[in-house]
């Protein structure tokens, strides 16, 4: 595989520690390219890339791009970043992350999973399935897949499984042979501006599927179903609906596992089990059953693959137990994800749930405040902390205080505001033996779980 014919390329990633950027960087490193990058902080991800031969520097500086051939950025990188400014001055090509991902995908049959929620889990399941089936895929995922030990995998096979990011429209760079859409909810409206523009973006993504490919669409979701009259590519649907081409029935949630019967139209494919928490994961697994069946993977192989899936970090990850308290961490940061994860915690444990939630981005808090206000009903106790800005400037009215007031106004009886540095100590005062503590959010809330465990063990 060669992306550059003239000479080995030196590829530089601005913000290489991001989960989406690092996966592409790792694949390129494994292909033998000279990869460098910068990030504001050191992390497990940057240390891993350095161990693979990447040149990773802390902080952003113009001299980091002096000897590179191409600069890769994500939508989180500002145009006044010193490395971007210097690359522009030197006329070094600057390309978005999705364009580099698309270049890798052009050499493979792409399996691209998109959707407002569930895409990391579904992408991980799909990559695990193809690996289990002996197809040795390349994969780039938005989370660390436990069976791979990474968020990226370089395979020798013909398939590449990727998580398609709709947040900035960059998934429209991706050329999918198989495109999956799990759901479409109002999200990332700072980029899309309107829900109709977001819907049109997903439609354009689906219609990029070539004549020999297939779109796999969740008919249970009304916005996804509304696309069907306008879809020009060949497609099949999946869901619990009796109109679905691939249907799940007899869904059973039992502890840390979900089981369901799968049908292709009226033909039974058998009963499947996946060790994931929450009823919603039946549909994520069903999407993978549909992928496998459309690719000709035998149902027995799919059944074995789903049963052996080891999960994804920060997707209902049990961080530990101390003092009779179990601490679980999850990336959920959209109201629909919050609801599903809290319900999953209740179904899995049947115990009191204490939720530590960190809102992510001012724009999301502002745009989805009414939805957030009713998302925490399955939390017995809610400790709400400061908004994680993710590079955004504050917005008047988009505050944790406003969110707490909205949640209380909708009837929640136990909501407290706690500054992030005090969160673990506040949780320590509220928990009791038998509780489930769920840390929720896409920011640094993930560190609160280990902090609490340390206090409980002291």
Swiss-Prot record:
What family classification does the UniProt entry report for this protein? Belongs to the MurCDEF family.
What is the species listed in this Swiss-Prot or TrEMBL entry? Anaeromyxobacter sp. (strain Fw109-5)
Write out the annotated subcellular location: Cytoplasm
List the GO terms this entry assigns under cellular component, sorted alphabetically.
cytoplasm
Q: What's the name of the protein?
A: UDP-N-acetylmuramate--L-alanine ligase
Q: Please name the pathway.
A: Cell wall biogenesis; peptidoglycan biosynthesis
Any idea what job this protein has?
Cell wall formation.
- One MF term in the entry's GO annotations: ATP binding
- Any keyword Nucleus? no
Coarse class of the primary localization is: cytoplasm
Looking up Pfam families in the UniProt record yields:
Mur_ligase, Mur_ligase_C, Mur_ligase_M
State its Enzyme Commission number(s): 6.3.2.8
What is the catalytic activity of this protein?
UDP-N-acetyl-alpha-D-muramate + L-alanine + ATP = UDP-N-acetyl-alpha-D-muramoyl-L-alanine + ADP + phosphate + H(+)
UniProt keyword annotation of Cell division present: yes
Annotated GO biological processes are: cell division; cell wall organization; peptidoglycan biosynthetic process; regulation of cell shape
- Gene3D superfamilies for this protein: Mur ligase, C-terminal domain (3.90.190.20), Mur-like, catalytic domain (3.40.1190.10), NAD(P)-binding Rossmann-like Domain (3.40.50.720)
Binding residues for ATP: 115-121
Q: Which UniProt keywords apply?
A: ATP-binding, Cell cycle, Cell division, Cell shape, Cell wall biogenesis/degradation, Cytoplasm, Ligase, Nucleotide-binding, Peptidoglycan synthesis
């Amino acid at each position: 595989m060669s992306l550059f014919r003239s000479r080995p390329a030196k590829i530089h990633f601005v913000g290489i520690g991001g989960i989406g950027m690092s996966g592409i960087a790792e694949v390129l490193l494994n292909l033998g390219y000279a990869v460098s990058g910068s990030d504001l902080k050191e992390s497990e991800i940057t240390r891993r890339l350095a161990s693979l031969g990447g040149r990773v520097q802390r902080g952003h500086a113009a001299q980091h791009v002096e000897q590179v051939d191409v600069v890769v950025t994500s939508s989180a990188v500002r145009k006044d970043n010193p490395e971007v400014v210097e690359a522009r001055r030197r006329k070094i090509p600057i390309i978005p992350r999705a364009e580099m991902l698309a270049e890798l995908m052009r050499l493979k049959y792409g399996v691209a999973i998109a959707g407002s929620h569930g895409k990391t889990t579904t992408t991980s399941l799909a990559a695990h399935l193809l690996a289990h089936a002996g197809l040795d895929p390349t994969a780039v995922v938005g989370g660390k897949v436990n069976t791979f030990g990474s968020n990226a995998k370089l395979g020798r096979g013909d398939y590449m499984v990727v998580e398609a990011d709709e947040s900035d429209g960059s998934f429209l760079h991706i050329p999918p042979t198989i495109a999956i859409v799990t759901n479409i909810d109002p999200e990332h409206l700072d980029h899309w501006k309107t829900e109709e523009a977001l819907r049109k973006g997903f439609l354009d993504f689906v219609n990029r599927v070539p004549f020999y490919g297939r779109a796999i669409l969740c008919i249970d979701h009304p916005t996804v179903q509304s696309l069907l009259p306008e879809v020009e590519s060949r497609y099949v649907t999946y869901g619990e609906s009796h109109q679905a081409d691939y249907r799940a029935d007899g869904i059973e949630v039992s502890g840390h596992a979900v089981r369901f019967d799968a049908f292709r139209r009226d033909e039974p494919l058998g009963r499947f089990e996946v060790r994931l928490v929450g009823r919603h994961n039946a549909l994520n697994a069903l999407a993978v059953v549909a992928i496998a069946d459309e690719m000709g993977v035998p149902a027995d192989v799919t059944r074995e693959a789903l049963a052996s899936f080891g999960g994804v970090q920060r997707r209902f990850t049990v961080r530990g137990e101390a003092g009779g308290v179990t601490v679980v961490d999850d990336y959920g940061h959209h109201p629909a994800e919050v609801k599903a994860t809290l319900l999953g915690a209740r179904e899995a444990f049947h115990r009191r749930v204490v939720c530590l939630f960190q809102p992510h981005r001012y724009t999301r808090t502002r745009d989805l405040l009414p939805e957030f206000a009713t998302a925490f009903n399955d939390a017995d106790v809610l400790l709400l902390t400061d908004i994680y800005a993710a590079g955004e400037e504050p917005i008047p009215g988009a505050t944790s205080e406003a969110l707490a007031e909205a949640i209380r106004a909708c009837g929640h009886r136990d909501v407290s505001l706690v500054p992030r540095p005090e969160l673990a100590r506040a949780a320590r005062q509220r928990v009791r033996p038998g509780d489930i503590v769920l840390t929720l959010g896409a920011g640094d809330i993930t560190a609160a779980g280990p902090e609490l465990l340390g206090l409980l063990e002291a």
